[in-house]
Design a protein with these regions (language model features):
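Bacterial N-terminal signal peptides that target proteins for export
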Residues: 1-11
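Conserved C-terminal helix/tail region of periplasmic/extracytoplasmic solute-binding proteins
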Residues: 338-369
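Mature extracytoplasmic/periplasmic domains
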Residues: 277, 282-343
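Extracytoplasmic ligand-binding site segments that recognize negatively charged/polar headgroups
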Residues: 88-217, 225-229
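Early extracytoplasmic/lumenal segment of secretory-pathway proteins
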Residues: 27-91
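Extracytoplasmic/periplasmic substrate-binding proteins
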Residues: 220-284, 322-333
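Alpha-to-beta junction loops
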Residues: 54, 74-81, 96-98, 169-174, ...
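Sec/Tat signal peptide C-region and signal peptidase I cleavage site
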Residues: 20-26
């Protein structure tokens, strides 16, 4: 509107050419974003587009390995990516993630300092590459009635329920699903055996491989979204990320099928993993300017709260908590207690030889070797 007032005296043709140029410029503002499926508020992207006049091409992926492969191959085509901070740490070392211009991210002030410190100490020295998004842990989501109906002696609350072949053999009758995520399951298995979740000892991976081989015949599927089908009694047990367990419980209530789901964390010191997912900008991103604008927008407390209310994941945004539904903030599945967090472990970047060991262990597990 201001432009047309300034140039009221020019010819109609000139005004039209300016309008066309402005329209083309607006259309040129395209931001390409990728994230896990169902991991953002329902209106978050639309509201960003409406406010800033930027078209967002939003893509989803279903495994950390798939986005890793795209980023490592180069020319991913993305301007903004959500990734597990532990996995992304090695991408940073490889120069695949761009440093952030924090002068354009004034909303970093809303992020929990404890989480920023966690990132700096474990994965992103100096907090130069990552904007924390969500955090949480993993555990077991289960249909208690179906479990006990199938196997009255099931050790509910113990990780033996999923790692002991004697128990798994019985529970296979009502369906057991594992996360399709070696970065979660392999450290979980190491911890269950009382070993270092970040072990670099080949013998430890042999022990894990042997344990997983014994339970493999009883794993129905490897699926990060199996929790969505638990209200239909397709599975009685599933390893899930904590908030997905909460979503499963809510889904069961909404489905009104009479199914009641519960969730538990691995108990004991160093047996549950603390993870943080972060926003980051690939080094080959074409639109870094608007990528920073998007990250700053995502850190608004009300936006972060909307994302948590939809996904039921714990936001890293400290100032968003007053806007988040109590149903979410009061659940240990979504927001583990401080006592639980203190006992959790974090994963670190492993040497390439150990990464290959982990990959081989996982591949053999899924293949039943």
């Amino acid at each position: 509107m201001t432009t047309s007032k300034k140039w009221m005296s020019v010819s109609i043709a000139a005004v039209m050419s300016v309008a066309i140029a402005q329209s083309a410029s607006a259309q040129d503002r395209v931001l390409k974003v990728t994230n896990w499926g169902e991991y953002i508020g329902e209106e978050t992207i639309e509201n960003f587009e409406n406010e800033f006049g930027i078209e967002v091409i939003y893509d989803v992926y279903d495994s950390a390995e798939s986005i890793d492969a795209k980023l490592l191959a180069g020319n991913s085509g993305y301007d903004v990516v959500v990734h597990a901070s532990g996995d992304a740490a090695r991408l940073i070392k490889a120069g695949i993630i761009a440093p952030l211009d924090t002068s354009k991210l004034d909303n970093l002030k809303h992020i929990d300092p404890a989480i920023m410190e966690q990132l700096a100490s474990e994965w992103d020295p100096g907090n130069q590459h990552m904007v924390p998004y969500m955090w949480g842990t993993h555990g077991v989501t289960y249909n208690n009635e179906l479990v006990l109906e199938t196997y009255p002696d099931a050790p509910v609350g113990s990780m033996d329920m999923i790692f002991d072949p004697n128990h798994m053999k019985e529970l296979a009758k009502c369906g057991v699903s594992f996360l399709d995520s070696p970065g979660d399951i392999i450290p979980m298995a190491l911890a269950h055996l009382g070993l270092d979740p970040n072990s670099t000892n080949p013998e430890d991976y042999e022990k894990v491989g042997a344990m997983l081989a014994e339970i493999r015949p009883y794993v129905k599927t490897f699926d990060n979204y199996a929790y969505q089908r638990m209200p239909q009694r397709e599975f009685c047990v599933a390893t899930t990320w904590g908030p997905d367990g909460l979503l499963a419980m809510s889904g069961a209530v909404e489905a009104d099928t009479g199914v009641v789901l519960d969730f538990y964390l691995p108990s004991g010191e160093g047996t549950a993993q603390l993870w943080v997912d972060s926003w980051m900008i690939p080094a080959d991103a074409e639109n870094k300017e608007d990528a920073h604008l998007f990250l700053n927008y995502m850190m608004r407390p009300e936006v972060a709260a909307g994302d948590s209310n939809f996904t039921w994941y714990a936001t890293a945004n400290r100032d968003a908590k007053p806007f988040i539904d109590v149903e979410v903030t009061s659940s240990p599945a979504a927001f583990p207690t401080s006592d639980q967090v203190e006992k959790m472990y974090t994963t670190v970047v492993l040497p390439p030889r150990v990464e290959r060991l982990q990959t081989r262990t996982w591949t053999n597990f899924k293949a039943g070797n």
